[in-house]
């Protein structure tokens, strides 16, 4: 009799504890933070820019419609890794140690995910980390090697043997989304969670998923008013940046025209080798599909022998079409995450 009472009492206490945990979790919202790398606001159709109207992103727009659209928000640092460091610490770059690429974040600083853990959250990060240290304040992580690769990226994390990097076949945006949904499926349901899904996309050099190659070939995107701006009257920072489509983007790697290789030019050879490194990562099927799109396009370019502003326009269209095709995968990923959360 006593044993039964004790057992019932224990079960009652356990049930009460579980109910209290569920109630507490319900009062603390789950957090899903999706971060892209070099994603211009003009390319999110919720902002009403001409580019967004021609290449709409309805899944991303749903977030703006359901919540808040930030029109006057600015990053503390516009570089990828330093920007993430500001996010993780809530501190300016000169305070968190990550002022530019190549520097390491001050890991003695508190990451906001550590505070969430203290508040009972289960935390996870998937995709791009690139901070020069192991993720801190995360119960689960599955991160790229370095800044990651678009095709068949390497991941390591709390679920890989001995923390070693493992190549996973597929497109990085899709794979990271798969892992994010898998985490949400298998998380501790008694706790609220914070999931950070960090994409490589749409970082340079804009390698689109095979299914989106050519998606915008029939779209003529308007060239920005500043396309030919030399920034002569602007500040030193903007004047000295290498951000011109016509002057600084490279034929081989950026425009994906390996036929332009100049064996007498070191920059051309470096650009070609960088592109070949990406192509050689692909499976035979991926490589074949890539070639079926780019090689005919490149032949037309070489035959046309464009000059002057016609060539400038070709470069801009090639760039922005690849860029928006990469964003198409990001928008698809957002849609998948929202569909999961809506279930």
PLM features per residue range, with description:
Residues 2-4, 9-13, 18-343:
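Formylglycine-dependent sulfatase
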